[in-house]
Amino acid sequence: MSAQSARRCSWSPHLAFDAAITPNLRRWVTGDDGSLTARLVAASERFRVARLLQRPQRPLADEWQVLGQHDRTPALTREVLLICDDIPAIFAHTVVRQRHARRDWPFLRGLGERPLGGRLFVDPAVAREPFQFARLLPHHPLRQALQRVLPAMAPLPMLPARRSVFRRGDGVMLVTEVFLPDLLSRPSPGTEAIPYPRYLRTTDRSPSTHTTETKKETTR
C-alpha cells in the first residue's frame, strides 16, 4: 500500500455491511442528520467534551479538496472526544480553511471544551450536506490520531465513521465522527431528531475556559 493510499479511505453515501457493525451501532452511525451530541446526552447520565487539539495543520489527503483548497495548505483543525459516563464514545475531527474560520466560523476560536453542536444546530445560517460513511482501518491517519490518545483502540480492525460538510456564508467546515466501541452496547435513542438541549447552547459571550459536563439530574 502506498503512503498516499494509506491516507485515504472510501467514503460512500451508504454504510457498507460489516459483521462488526451491530444493528445498535448502525443506528448510531446512520441516525438522523441532527445533533449527535443531543443523542449522546439523551443516552447517558453524564456527558462532557475533552478537547485534544485545536491548531492549524495540513488537512488529510481526502479532505483538502472538500474544503475547496487547491493544495494541502494548513487548515484550522479541532479534535475532541465526546465522553459518556466517563467512557469515550466519539472521536470528532473538524477542519476549516483558516480564512473561513475567521470570517464565517469566528466562534471556533473560543469554543474550548464546549460542544461544536452548540453553535451549528441553533444557527439558521448553517446548512448541512448529506452524510458520507466509511470504515476506518488502523493505518488511516484519524485512527492513528485516536490511537495516540487511546492506545486500546489500536487492535480493533475497523471503526465506523461518518462525515458531513457544513456551510455558513462562503465558509466550508468538514466534520468527521469516528464511532467507538462504547456505542456497541449503549442503546441508541432512536433515529428521529432530538432537539438540541438548551443548556448546551453557546453564545459568543460564553467564556472560552468553560468545560461542558452535563448530568441528567441537574437538567430540565
Curated annotation (Swiss-Prot):
Binding site for substrate: R78, L116, E177
InterPro entries hit by this protein: Chorismate--pyruvate_lyase, Chorismate_lyase_/UTRA_dom_sf
Function: Removes the pyruvyl group from chorismate, with concomitant aromatization of the ring, to provide 4-hydroxybenzoate (4HB) for the ubiquinone pathway.
Protein name per UniProt: Probable chorismate pyruvate-lyase
Catalytic activity: chorismate = 4-hydroxybenzoate + pyruvate
A GO cellular component annotation in the UniProt record: cytosol
Family of the protein in this entry: Belongs to the UbiC family.
Localization in the cell: Cytoplasm
Keywords from the named record: Cytoplasm, Lyase, Pyruvate, Ubiquinone biosynthesis
SUPFAM superfamilies linked to this entry: Chorismate lyase-like
Organism expressing this protein natively: Cupriavidus necator (strain ATCC 17699 / DSM 428 / KCTC 22496 / NCIMB 10442 / H16 / Stanier 337)
